[in-house]
Amino acid sequence: MAVPTTRKDLMIVNMGPHHPSMHGVLRLIVTLDGEDVIDCEPIVGYLHRGMEKIAENRTIIQYLPYVTRWDYLATMFTEAITVNGPEQLGNIQVPKRASYIRVIMLELSRIASHLLWLGPFMADIGAQTPFFYILRERELIYDLFEAATGMRMMHNYFRIGGVAADLPYGWIDKCLDFCDYFLIGLTEYQKLITRNPIFLERVENVGIIGGEEAINWGLSGPMLRASGIQWDLRKVDHYECYDEFDWEVQWQKEGDSLARYLIRIGEMAESVKIIQQALEGIPGGPYENLEIRRFNRIKYPEWNDFEYRFISKKPSPAFELSKQELYVRVEAPKGELGIFLIGDQSVFPWRWKIRPPGFINLQILPQLVKKMKLADIMTILGSIDIIMGEVDR
């Protein structure tokens, strides 16, 4: 009878691109020595769609419905960054009411994104129950989005100079009711998760990043603030009307997966504070700067013909991008979402470079998982919070 021999060589394991814990089509080539991770190589690009090149062959109005496919769980932020660039290039003023509506929608989108991070993150480390609680609250946010924009996801709500439509009758009261209800739900999550000994065993002192290390890697968002760096673009860049509200930047100094969890929980509570203040203080006035609608004002007689009205293509309003370059950024749920925009006196951008937070934050994954256990890969990857739509673009 043959005696089984023990192999001592390293083992290479492919995780993904179809693994449920990969949060999209991410592939990890993991080198293992037993349960210990020796090396990890992320392979990205499976969801690449050429979004930057598409932007350079479209007007901003034509491109706007497509940008929601970058980070498809926080679509308001991709719309915000797409209209902020042309607004700054053209010195277009946004009415105060429109700015308040934008802030409300952005913070609701931040809560929805953090909720859909928290549910799968808990499922990855073995806790299924919170996932169902979290979807309950997230559906309420999507109900609010549907009432205001007509769409539960991929809203196409932001416009250059404002938003597409004003808030419907009764929406503000409905949103205030949601805020009160959600704060109770958030307390439930914390009771269920934060002091759970099994949860703490999986996340405490796992995936530690120091402050200087986080800056050197170019990390942003909760990944940066969990390492003791108090950097939030809503406070730093003073965009929209965030300065008019009373709220605190959430940060921790431990730098581990638990710190990143605590920051996102804290950010949801702060987002509710911002939304409540904005709803109670929202001013009257227009929801869009109508003066910047530049339609072709020449009227042609064939415009009333049957063929034109029902068959021909109508030109969309075009905004000429002045000949200069500009970098604009917003504080998205996953970090700094930026656009480097170059105009050349054309309605098309000459260059449209996307700076996705998930792609930059993912760079540090191989360093974090080395010398850890195989099971810790799921914890660390989940705490980074990536969406492959924005990683691959």
Curated annotation (Swiss-Prot):
It is a peripheral membrane protein. Keywords: Chloroplast, Membrane, NAD, NADP, Plastid, Plastoquinone, Quinone, Thylakoid, Translocase, Transport. One of its GO terms (cellular component) is chloroplast thylakoid membrane. One of its GO terms (molecular function) is NAD binding. It is an enzyme of class 7 (translocase). Its EC number is 7.1.1.-. It catalyses: a plastoquinone + NADH + (n+1) H(+)(in) = a plastoquinol + NAD(+) + n H(+)(out); a plastoquinone + NADPH + (n+1) H(+)(in) = a plastoquinol + NADP(+) + n H(+)(out). Its main location: plastid. Coiled coil: none annotated. The keyword NADP applies. It is found in: Plastid, Chloroplast thylakoid membrane. Signal peptide: none annotated. One of its GO terms (biological process) is photosynthesis, light reaction. It holds the Pfam family Complex1_49kDa. The keyword Translocase applies. NDH is composed of at least 16 different subunits, 5 of which are encoded in the nucleus. HAMAP family: NDH1_NuoD (MF_01358). Belongs to the complex I 49 kDa subunit family. NDH shuttles electrons from NAD(P)H:plastoquinone, via FMN and iron-sulfur (Fe-S) centers, to quinones in the photosynthetic chain and possibly in a chloroplast respiratory chain. The immediate electron acceptor for the enzyme in this species is believed to be plastoquinone. Couples the redox reaction to proton translocation, and thus conserves the redox energy in a proton gradient. This is NAD(P)H-quinone oxidoreductase subunit H, chloroplastic. It comes from Spinacia oleracea (Spinach). The gene is ndhH.
